[in-house]
């Protein structure tokens, strides 16, 4: 800056009106780097006395300003800075005076809302290369912070160099560790070295995480330090004996927060790879394998903890050792642990094996019931849960196969063999045998089981009483929907809607295949079969939706039958028009049967059950919102 420019600015400052209650103006020209000391003799400002501090005249200047001359205007040139404000004899006068700076650093500090203190000025000087770029300055400015301490300025400058829009030291550390473990190829660390201050970075690292920088493998060791210090927050110290060099006790909570924050981000793939690398380098899995399950339950951070826990349980299950209480406790406990999204389906498998085993233990003696109605009650109130546990196990098992874990895949498959034995060879065998024996006399004499509602009475018992001038009966028929799936859907409807749901069961017609079951749900007096094995109701065919609609209309002319997919594709106005004036609406849904009825896709039936429940919940919303269902 030229002497002319400085002189012009200072003359303007002194010519400006004085603040209220002030009789004169004193301005301290701060120039710690003595950039403008040589220009001082050329400076002339009318009616202003210019004084230069020499380091030995401070007391004399103070006496002059506070005693000898209380009315004169003064420009005090100060080329000194003080590490300790107590050393500044003129600090009290500076407090009620004005400040002027003419150097680039001061201009920059003012522009970026950086406090004009010696400590902040020193910090700005550290980043000369950073401030060479207008783009970097603009990005720092956009953070919009006021800087009163060097710490926050260090952090924000490094955040800019890491490609962030501000943040915390934690965000900077995550950005550095995400960029790779090799210092030469780590773009973020290279930026900090080139345009920032690498020493300041490692000082920040030490302050927050406790890691002391080492020249060899600095990033690798930093990563290991953060992860193991975080692990120490949730694991018994005895497990980590021999790894003390990687752990800072006073920084455990902070390191844990780094990992927790990073892991909860969508882009946590680099953390996963980092954990895997450290696990392998320090042989952590073998260390965890020596611990009991209770010790590992609360431990977090490393994926191998999940693998050790699950591997042990699956191996035990395959050997017919099923610790139900511990398995249930583990499955529930681990649902909130880190990396659960990658292991959730495995824990679901564990959970449902335990639930199946519990049911088995409660009924290990078998089912010795002779009354059909009592067996019916047992199944509809309790035993159906075994079917539900089995389905949920296989659904979770199928999900694991879509993105399998090499260490767990075979162990889970061996555990699945135990599940099949428990379900097929015990549950189905025992319950089916009991049921078959109990109903044999009824079937021989009547062709059905007495004292249990019949599918053939569905229309007269459930539909007809609801259909009338002031009400409309909606019937959603989902082919091959098992009772246990319906029970879960009933709970879902109760939980997610304002209405109420009730679950009931009736015995199917024989044979219990689709074309007979669909016909049995229609009104009419007589069910028969022609020579072509077509099922008829009162001599009318029942194969197609239109044919079923005609049978419905024969019983109530204000009826309609439609497929779920057709309703789904209709516009809202079309849906309203479809049911206008109707008292009975049959909607046919076929997701499960369409999958399970064909050999190539029958293994997908467990997925189809999940889809079916979502679709049935959806059609229920459509009925309520678009078809005036209540």
Features from the language model and the residues they span:
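…; additionally, a secondary subgroup of soluble metalloenzymes is captured
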Residues: 1-472, 482-629
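Hydrophobic "anchor" residues on beta-strands that sit immediately upstream
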Residues: 475
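Ligand-binding pocket scaffold of soluble enzyme catalytic domains
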Residues: 479
């Amino acid at each position: 800056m030229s002497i002319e420019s400085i002189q012009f600015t200072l003359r303007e400052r002194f010519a400006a009106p004085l603040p209220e209650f002030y009789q004169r103006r004193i301005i301290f020209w701060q120039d710690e780097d003595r950039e403008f000391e040589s220009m001082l003799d050329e400076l002339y400002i009318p009616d202003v006395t210019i004084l230069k501090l020499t380091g030995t005249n401070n007391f004399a200047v103070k006496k002059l300003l506070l005693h000898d001359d209380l009315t004169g205007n003064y420009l005090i040139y100060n080329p000194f800075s003080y590490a300790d404000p107590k050393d500044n004899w003129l600090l009290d006068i500076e407090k009620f005076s004005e400040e002027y700076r003419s150097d680039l650093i001061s201009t920059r500090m003012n522009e970026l809302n950086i406090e004009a203190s010696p400590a902040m000025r020193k910090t700005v000087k550290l980043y000369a290369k950073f401030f060479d770029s207008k783009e970097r300055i603009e990005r720092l400015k956009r953070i919009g912070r006021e800087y009163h301490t060097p710490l926050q300025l260090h952090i924000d400058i490094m955040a800019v160099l890491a490609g962030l829009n501000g943040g915390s030291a934690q965000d900077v550390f995550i950005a550095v560790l995400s960029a790779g473990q090799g210092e030469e190829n780590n773009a973020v660390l290279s930026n900090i070295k080139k345009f920032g201050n690498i020493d300041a970075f490692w000082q920040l690292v030490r302050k927050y995480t406790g890691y002391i920088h080492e020249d060899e493998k600095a990033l690798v060791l930093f990563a290991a330090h953060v992860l193991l210090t975080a692990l120490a927050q949730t694991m018994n110290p005895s497990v980590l004996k021999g790894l003390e060099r990687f752990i800072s006790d006073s920084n455990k909570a902070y390191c844990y927060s780094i990992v927790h924050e990073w892991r909860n981000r969508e882009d946590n793939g680099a953390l996963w790879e980092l954990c895997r690398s450290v696990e392998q380098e320090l042989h952590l899995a073998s260390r965890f394998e020596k611990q009991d399950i209770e010790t590992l339950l609360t431990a977090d951070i490393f994926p191998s903890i999940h693998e050790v826990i699950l591997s042990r349980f699956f191996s035990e299950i395959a050997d017919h050792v099923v610790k139900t209480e511990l398995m249930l406790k583990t499955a529930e406990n681990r649902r909130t642990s880190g990396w659960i999204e990658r292991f959730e389906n495995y824990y679901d498998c564990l959970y449902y094996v335990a639930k199946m085993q519990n049911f088995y233990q409660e009924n290990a003696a078998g089912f010795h019931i002779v009354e059909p109605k009592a067996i019916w009650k047992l199944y509809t109130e309790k035993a159906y849960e075994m079917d539900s546990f089995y389905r949920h196990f296989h659904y979770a098992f199928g999900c694991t196969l879509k993105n399998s874990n090499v260490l767990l895949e075979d162990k889970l498959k061996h555990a699945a063999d135990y599940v099949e034995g428990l379900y097929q060879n015990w549950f189905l065998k025992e319950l089916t045998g009991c049921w078959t024996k109990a109903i044999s006399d009824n079937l021989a004499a009547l062709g059905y089981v007495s004292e249990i509602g019949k599918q053939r009475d569905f229309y007269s018992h459930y539909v007809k009483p609801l259909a009338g001038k002031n009400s409309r009966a909606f019937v959603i028929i989902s082919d091959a929907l098992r009772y246990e799936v319906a029970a879960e859907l009933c709970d879902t409807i109760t939980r997610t809607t304002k209405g109420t749901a009730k679950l009931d069961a009736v015995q199917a017609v024989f044979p219990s295949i689709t074309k007979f079951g669909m016909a049995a749900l229609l009104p009419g007096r007589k069910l028969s079969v022609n020579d072509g094995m077509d099922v008829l109701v009162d001599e009318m065919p029942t194969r197609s939706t239109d044919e079923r609609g005609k049978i419905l209309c024969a019983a109530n002319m204000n009826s309609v039958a439609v497929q779920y997919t057709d309703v789904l594709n209709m516009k809202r106005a079309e849906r309203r028009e479809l049911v206008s004036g109707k008292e009975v609406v049959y909607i046919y849904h076929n997701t499960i049967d369409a999958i399970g009825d064909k050999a190539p896709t029958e293994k997908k039936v467990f997925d189809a059950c999940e889809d079916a429940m979502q679709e049935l919940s959806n059609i229920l919303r459509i009925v309520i919102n678009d078809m005036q269902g209540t």
